[in-house]
Amino acid sequence: MKVTILNGEPTAGSGFDAWVHEVAARARDAHEVQLLELRDLELKGCSGCFGCWVRTPGECVKRDDSALICRAAVGSDLLVLASPLVMGFTTSLLKSAADQLIPILHPYIVIEGGEMHHRARYEHYPQIALLLGQDPGGNAEDLEITTRMWARMARNMKSRLVFSAVAGRTPEEVAYDLAAAA
């Protein structure tokens, strides 16, 4: 199984960062794992220009590292979104990277399950997993809201959220559950 982890931790070497790296190392025992450190990539952010649909179909017109993220996502069986919670939600690094996944869809709209969604650009989309670090001032409701939002994002990206874990579980447990979920 091909696994891509988008690490949205802005601080290298933090406790959450170390946990994500350990989960990746454990997952490598059984799977092909690519760990992308979002803090080290050039991401210019989505401006909503829709150039990725019109001018350069399937690729952001800004020519940043979002193309790397899109290729990695579409080429994976499992896309793991990792972020500590900050003020009750994932980091801006992860949100910005997710916003720049829009080129992997067509601009055309279809009705699915009574809802409007973009048409798929590719035949294969990865399942989505979520690794979260609890906000020191946060609570269970923050985790629930964040998980529901990313589940919705997964649905909009022709996928589904198959797994969610909070830092504190052992990396071995999480790696095992990631493999079982996909």
Description of each model-found segment:
Residues 1-81, 87-106, 169-182:
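N-terminal beta1-alpha1-beta2 submodule of the flavodoxin-like/Rossmannoid cofactor-binding fold
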Residues 1-4, 79, 124-131, 160-163:
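Hydrophobic beta-strand segments of well-ordered beta-sheets in folded domains
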Residues 43, 120-123, 165-168:
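Mobile beta-alpha loop/short-helix "lid" or hinge segments that flank ligand
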Residues 76, 82-83, 92, 129, ...:
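Small-side-chain structural scaffolding
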Residues 106-156:
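Short, glycine-/small-residue-rich phosphate/pyrophosphate-handling segment
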Residues 137-182:
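Glycine-rich phosphate/pyrophosphate-binding loop and the adjoining helix
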